[in-house]
């Protein structure tokens, strides 16, 4: 069975490598350098398991820039292209997904298309009506950037947005490649599957925002935030997870998914969803004000990446802090090894860590790290538990 993956980011690659253990997989991408790396068994993204599997496992996997080669004769086409949130329209930009669908319909109209990209609630059914097609359904992904393949090898659940034989066969592909057995698998309608994805991520954002507000309260009143969080989380109904204070929720998924869900609530009474989005802005204001209260001459930003083990800093929360500090006229320098540019938003990138430490009189870091241990007195962080 030939499976095509359109898009070789975290979602596309992790699904492709998972399935390529047992089936032919062809990955399509428009970036020639990424395709070349993949065909040399090298990962274009930082992900321990993806790197390991490409280098050491027997995979029936190749990549191409040729859409005709990729889509021809494929049984399933997994669509994993980016859907950025457009603040002007209050809607995901689904143009890349729609472009793939048009190409597949033109080249291989019998292929079953599976959307893995995050999309608005109701999008799949709207597409079916608009294009007059039925060979498509949505299946959300639940993964962490930097651990994408691990999360597909050990999934918490599989959700398939269709009840049919072809949906069952697709679920079997994911189950077959996983290390974990007896995976909870849920078959729903596509619209319900779309809602599951957005509500799951919005709940995670809610939890981040909750513990951040607890931490803001503790810092404002001079209380020990760690003791409070530990005491609260010993209640098994709350649990000791996803509770580490931060500069706000960030990254590619949570900010855009919460805003999209809020937009989907346009005609539905709500309070909590809007409050989550507002709380994240308030947290960034609070953090920036706390840093500025120390009257720094130069603020050093240690790492722009969203989390450890990732090379991605799309919409990382520390960027919001950085912009607020710069808006008050305080110079900002950046230490970020994965950057090739010399500037980021008009702030200088310092490549030498020692020089960076010497030049900054306050260093802000979303998480404490051993690299900063020798200048701990300069470091401002709200991370308490050494985890993302």
From Swiss-Prot:
Its EC number is 1.1.1.22. Transmembrane segments: none annotated. Gene3D superfamilies: N-(1-d-carboxylethyl)-l-norvaline Dehydrogenase, domain 2, NAD(P)-binding Rossmann-like Domain. It catalyses: UDP-alpha-D-glucose + 2 NAD(+) + H2O = UDP-alpha-D-glucuronate + 2 NADH + 3 H(+). InterPro entries: 6-PGluconate_DH-like_C_sf, 6PGD_dom2, NAD(P)-bd_dom_sf, UDP-Glc/GDP-Man, UDP-Glc/GDP-Man_DH_C, UDP-Glc/GDP-Man_DH_C_sf, UDP-Glc/GDP-Man_DH_dimer, UDP-Glc/GDP-Man_DH_N. The keyword Phosphoprotein applies. One of its GO terms (molecular function) is UDP-glucose 6-dehydrogenase activity. Keywords: NAD, Oxidoreductase, Phosphoprotein. Substrate binds at residues 141-145, 197, 201, 242-246, 250, 307. Phosphorylated on a tyrosine residue. It results in a significant increase of the dehydrogenase activity. Signal peptide: none annotated. The keyword NAD applies. Pathway: Nucleotide-sugar biosynthesis; UDP-alpha-D-glucuronate biosynthesis; UDP-alpha-D-glucuronate from UDP-alpha-D-glucose: step 1/1; Bacterial outer membrane biogenesis; lipopolysaccharide biosynthesis. NAD(+) binds at residues 2-19, 29, 34, 83, 118, 145, 252, 256, 314. It is an enzyme of class 1 (oxidoreductase). The active site is at 253 (nucleophile). Belongs to the UDP-glucose/GDP-mannose dehydrogenase family. This is UDP-glucose 6-dehydrogenase. It comes from Escherichia coli O111:H-.
């Amino acid at each position: 069975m030939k499976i095509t993956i359109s898009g070789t980011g975290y979602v596309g690659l992790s699904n492709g490598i998972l399935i390529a253990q047992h089936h032919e997989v062809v990955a399509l991408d428009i970036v020639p350098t990424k395709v070349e790396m993949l065909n040399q068994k090298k990962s274009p993204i930082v992900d321990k398991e993806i790197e390991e599997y490409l280098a050491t496992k027997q995979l029936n996997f190749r990549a191409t820039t040729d859409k005709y080669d990729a889509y021809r004769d494929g049984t399933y086409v997994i669509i994993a292209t980016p859907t950025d949130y457009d603040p002007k329209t209050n809607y995901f930009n689904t143009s890349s997904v729609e472009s793939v669908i048009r190409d597949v319909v033109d080249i291989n109209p019998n292929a079953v298309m599976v959307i893995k990209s995050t999309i608005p609630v109701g999008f799949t059914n709207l597409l079916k009506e608009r294009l007059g097609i039925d060979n498509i359904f949505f299946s959300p992904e639940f993964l962490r950037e930097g651990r994408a393949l691990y999360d597909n090898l050990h999934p918490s659940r599989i959700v398939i947005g269709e009840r049919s034989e072809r949906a069952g066969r697709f679920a079997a592909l994911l189950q077959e490649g996983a290390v974990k057995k007896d995976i909870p698998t849920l078959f729903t309608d596509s619209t319900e599957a779309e809602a599951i994805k957005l509500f799951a991520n919005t709940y995670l954002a809610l939890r981040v925002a909750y513990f951040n507000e607890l931490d803001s309260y503790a810092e404002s009143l001079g209380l020990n935030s760690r003791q409070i969080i530990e005491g609260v989380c010993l209640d098994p109904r709350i649990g000791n997870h996803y509770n580490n204070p931060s500069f706000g929720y960030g990254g590619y998924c949570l900010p855009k998914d919460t805003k999209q869900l809020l937009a989907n609530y346009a005609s539905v009474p709500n309070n909590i969803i809007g409050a989550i989005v507002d709380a994240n802005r308030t947290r960034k204001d609070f953090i920036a004000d706390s840093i500025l209260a120390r009257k720094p001459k130069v603020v050093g930003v240690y790492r722009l990446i969203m989390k450890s083990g990732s090379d991605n800093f799309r919409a990382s929360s520390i960027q919001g802090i950085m912009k607020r500090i710069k808006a008050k006229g305080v110079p900002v320098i950046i230490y970020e090894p994965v950057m090739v540019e010399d500037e980021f938003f008009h702030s200088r990138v310092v490549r030498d860590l020692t020089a960076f430490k010497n030049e900054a009189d306050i260093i802000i870091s979303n998480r404490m790290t051993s690299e900063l241990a020798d200048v701990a007195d300069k470091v401002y962080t709200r991370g308490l538990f050494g985890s993302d």
